[in-house]
Swiss-Prot record:
Sequence similarity: Belongs to the peptidase A8 family.
Principal subcellular localisation of the protein: membrane
Record's subcellular location: Cell membrane
Gene name for this UniProt entry: lspA
Protein name: Lipoprotein signal peptidase
Recorded catalytic activity of this chain's protein: Release of signal peptides from bacterial membrane prolipoproteins. Hydrolyzes -Xaa-Yaa-Zaa-|-(S,diacylglyceryl)Cys-, in which Xaa is hydrophobic (preferably Leu), and Yaa (Ala or Ser) and Zaa (Gly or Ala) have small, neutral side chains
Job description of the protein: This protein specifically catalyzes the removal of signal peptides from prolipoproteins.
């Protein structure tokens, strides 16, 4: 059940960082953290990643509730004893709930992490988005490693 602690930690860190941004920054304000690479940029997003489906909150409520239910079911039924699998699900669950809290309370998500690679500005994101991404990468690693074990590949 340690994976639920990971989920709670992700939610707490996500909500704390968003609260700090809302309390201390104006929308659109940018603070340079690492020159030419990392900025805190206060932004609100009423869509999904990269502002996909902006303005369709009902869709996000429905999908998020379904995803949260499925993840909790899978964690309870299949994750026990599978460390990497359960950790990946914990990150995904924490990220989903973190952004869901914003959508329920504010009908938008607070984003603030902005990275720049040369002339490319990566879309602004938050801790929940990062947790979702980490969870998906860990899940892919788990699937790849588990597949290799199943097939007996070293």
């Amino acid at each position: 059940m340690y994976y639920y602690l990971i989920t709670l930690a992700v939610i707490a860190l996500d909500q704390l960082t968003k609260w700090i941004v809302v309390q201390n920054m104006e929308i659109g304000q940018k603070i340079e953290v690492i020159p030419g690479f990392l900025y805190w940029t206060s932004y609100r997003n009423d869509g999904a990643a990269w502002s996909i489906l902006e303005g369709h909150m009902w869709f996000f409520y429905l999908i998020t509730v379904i995803v949260i239910g499925i993840i909790i079911y899978i964690m309870q039924k299949y994750a026990k004893g599978k460390r990497l699998f359960s950790i990946s699900l914990a990150f995904i669950l924490g990220g989903a709930i973190g952004n869901f809290i914003d959508r329920i309370l504010h009908q938008e998500v607070v984003d603030f992490v902005q990275t720049v690679w040369g002339n490319y500005y990566f879309p602004i994101f938050n801790v929940a988005d990062a947790a979702l991404s980490v969870g998906v990468v860990l899940m892919l690693v788990y699937v790849f490693v588990d597949d290799r074990k199943t097939k007996g590949i070293k």
